[in-house]
Amino acid sequence: MDKNELRHSIFATAKREGSLKESVIKHAGDYGINDVEELLPQAKQLTPEFVNSDVEWVDKVLQKVHKSPFARVKTLFLDITAETLRAKGYIKGTEKVEHVFELIKRNTEPTTIYTKQKIDRDDVIDVTDFPLVSWIKQEMELKLNEELARAILLGDGRVPGDPYKIDEECIRPIVKDDDLYSVKVELPADFMANQDYTQFIKTVARNRKKYKGSGSPALFASEDTIAELLLIEDSTGRLIYPTVEALKSALRVSDIIAVPELEGFVRETKDGKVHTVLGIIANLADYSLGADKGGEKALFDDFDIDFNQMKYLLETRRSGALVKPYSALIIENVE
């Protein structure tokens, strides 16, 4: 076979096989090179990517919360909303009456959250295509941050009694907090049946006056909820909120943050009712995340000489709670 015939044959085979490399290998024997694949460059190992749910919300949560240099948080309030506390008119000769107010307080103690990893030292030495140890540390920090952010908004989702559950008396989930801090706002009873998201907009608008937090809050919701709100149409089929900015304006919020963990999130109350949470409206500046000196994230590493393993521990000791009354609105459907 001459060179021209060989060249045409190689390219014809490449069209059928879909790969010039495979075609060259098939015709290698025609020009005296066997095992030509051994001469081809080897595949280059790239640094592995993490397969994980969307975690953009995690950074936003941890950036927005108030960082306190103290792990133990004590909140103290005087409830002066009672009718009996109003200033009174006086008629000469009558007795003046003192008013009595209620003192409300709570303490939040710190708890430890950690993630731990180990790897054989032989593997650390043998893996040369990317920095294995740095990659493991990156994964550990990613998962610790994600767990902390989840605990702040929703709780970690583990059942009571689970040995790994994050103590909800130490990191208080906004969605489950006392009504003094998180105001529960119920959607109309037929909301889930009708899937009419205009009711969501109206319910938020009518209950916005109950929000007493700092500044302009943000809405935390699932991607599906945000999509349904953006797809609300008028009677002519035109989108009422064609952009996120228009939706933010209608809801009177400064930001809309998608939280995958809110998809289908429910909480059960002592009366047996199921509350499906559709959204959380809060300014996380009103959530205090406290840590004493040394309680911030700390990484420890050790070497186990018996098993030839490198071990890593990343942990933080924190407390967390809303510190301002009525600083969150929980938009939910009750069944």
Segment roles from a protein language model:
Residues 38-45, 53-57, 131, 135, ...:
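Generic recognition of stable, solvent-exposed alpha-helical segments in well-folded globular domains
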Residues 16-116:
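Assembly/oligomerization interface modules of large self-assembling protein complexes
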Residues 319-335:
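Structural signal for terminal/edge beta-strands and the immediately following C-terminal loop/tail
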Residues 96, 105-110, 114-203, 330-335:
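Alpha-helical scaffold segments that mediate packing/assembly in large oligomeric complexes
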Residues 1-19:
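Intrinsically disordered, low-complexity, charge-biased terminal/linker regions in eukaryotic proteins
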Residues 60, 85-89, 99, 126-128, ...:
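Short helix/loop capping segments that flank catalytic or ligand/cofactor-binding pockets
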Residues 158-305, 310, 314-316, 335:
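Extended oligomerization regions of viral-like shell subunits
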Residues 121, 316-320:
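Beta-strand elements of well-folded, non-transmembrane domains
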